[in-house]
Amino acid sequence: MATATPSGPRSSGRRSSMSTPLSPTRITRLQEKVDLQELNDRLALYIDTVRSLESENSLLHVQVTEREEVRSREVSGIKELYETELADARRSLDDTAREKARLQLELSKVSVEHQDLQASFSKRESELESTQARFRETEALLNSKNAALATAQSENKSLQGEVEDLKAEIGQLGSALALAKKQLEEEILMKVDLENRCQSLIEELNFRKNIYEEEIKETSRRHETRLVEVDSGRQVDYEYKLSQALSEMREQQESQIGLYKEELEQTYQSKLENARLASEMNSSAVNSTREELMESRIRIDSLTSQLSELQKESRAWHDRMQELEDMLAKEKDNSRKMLAEREREMADIRDQMQQQLNDYEQLLDVKLALDMEISAYRKLLEGEEERLKLSPSPSRVTVSRASSSRAVRTTKGKRKRIDVEESEASSSVSIDHSAAATGDVSIEEVDVDGKYIRLKNNSEKDHPLGGWELTRTIGEASVNFKFTSRYVLKAEQTVTIWAADAGVKASPPSDLIWKNQNSWGTGEDVKATLKNSQGEEVAQRTTIYTTNIPEEEFEEGEEIFEETAKEFHYPQQKSGNKNCAIM
């Protein structure tokens, strides 16, 4: 290694040269020596500069390496986060699309049910209107019957008043009849008394007549005795006078007796006639009263029968009206209950639709937020790529439907110096589904989120699944669902067994809820098997997740690091080789 020459000999040489003359050869050598010293000084300075530059270069290389590692980690983290969020966004969009399709189907079903309910409701309304019309007709008829009943009751009251009047009149006539009977009895007693008096008078008259005859006989006997004494001349005159006087007395007595008898007979006949007339009048009044009473009784009986018939008819109409009112109340209650139930169902459906709309809005908000974040990440990456002068290529997402797998690939541009080149096919995650069935029932679908498993009857006949067991295995963990003994899967129909936390209502026989299990479980390798009641496996379905990293990624990574190493290390090695050559 060249070193600097001390200044002492150089000054002494100069002094000696000044003191003694130098030859041209000496001057040339001295000049060459001075040039060599200057070259050595410049070389030493260059070596020091190269060493300092190498140390700075090594420090810069370390810093660049650290920054590149940090950058690569940040880019890989951002890329993974972006890819995971993008995959989650796509998954959520797929779930949203499936949920939207399912909700559209449910909405169509609900709309059909709503139309059916509206038709049944309109039918019930028409029936209710017809029932109300019949009720109004019945009510009008009942009102007419009530009016007729009121008129009949008023007539009955008037007839009862007449009956009371007739009863009062009958009482008066009865009292008059009793009075007439009493008078008749008194007249009869008076007649008997008068007859007795007449008989006693006749007997008294006969007795007096006998007494008179006896007196006459006694007088005649006396006169005879006197006549014996009287002369025969005056006897004839005396007898004539006596006979005349006797005849006069007899006529007077007979006339008096006749008058008295006639007077008695007239009095008796008049009283008897009066009594007979009074009796006839009383009997005619009683007969007329009896006839009127009979007519009144007949009329009362007819009115009573009519009243009873009207009351029976009124009770029948009242019962019918009560029955119709009960039927109408029941129909109203049923209609009200049906309307309340339908309104509650519509409210539930509206709540579900509102909840689904809210979920849609939340999903749309999440989607918009993800889109905004993705656009922000894209702008950030584009800004970094523009700042680092990269040539970016658009990302690409491929979905393989034929093999039932999904692959997410992103392409990245090639960077200079500290930028990292990423391959076009960086990574892929595939989901492979395989299914097999030995019978008519197959496992149609297994949800990757563990919400449901769907079975399908591929035959044209109903298939009983009583005692069948559905098992889902993830690694070493497994869950079992057993069908009830009476369950039958209809021909060409599907049945979906939902987990308890799937948020779906039970709708047998197409949708069943496993209340004891919140989720079917999620994982990378999923296997679902269906066994019959004898324990034989009749169907299975397997879902396998596969992550592939292509060889081009490693090769391109090696090329990236080789180019980076060339860019950073080769200039240093070249400078070192130059230094060594110079040395």
From Swiss-Prot:
GO MF annotation terms: structural constituent of cytoskeleton
Domain LTD: from-to ranges: 429-547
Positions of region (Coil 1B): 82-215
Site (Heptad change of phase): Y268, K332
Lipidation, S-farnesyl cysteine type: C580
Keyword Oxidoreductase among UniProt keywords: no
Modification type Phosphoserine: residues: S23, S393
GO cellular component, as recorded: intermediate filament; nuclear envelope; nuclear lamina; nuclear matrix; nucleoplasm
SMART domains reported for this sequence: Filament (SM01391)
Chain residue ranges for the region called Linker 2: 216-243
Post-translational changes noted in the entry: Phosphorylation plays a key role in lamin organization, subcellular localization and nuclear envelope disintegration. Phosphorylation by CDK1 at Ser-23 at the onset of mitosis drives lamin disassembly and nuclear envelope breakdown.
Positions of region (Linker 1): 70-81
Maturation-removed propeptide residues: 581-583
Note: There are at least five different lamins in Xenopus: the somatic lamins L(I)/lmnb1.S, L(II)/lmnb2.L, and A/lmna.L; the oocyte germinal vesicle lamin L(III)/lmnb3.L; and the male germ cells lamin l(IV).
Name of this protein: Lamin-B1.S
UniProt source species: Xenopus laevis
Gene name tied to this protein: lmnb1.S
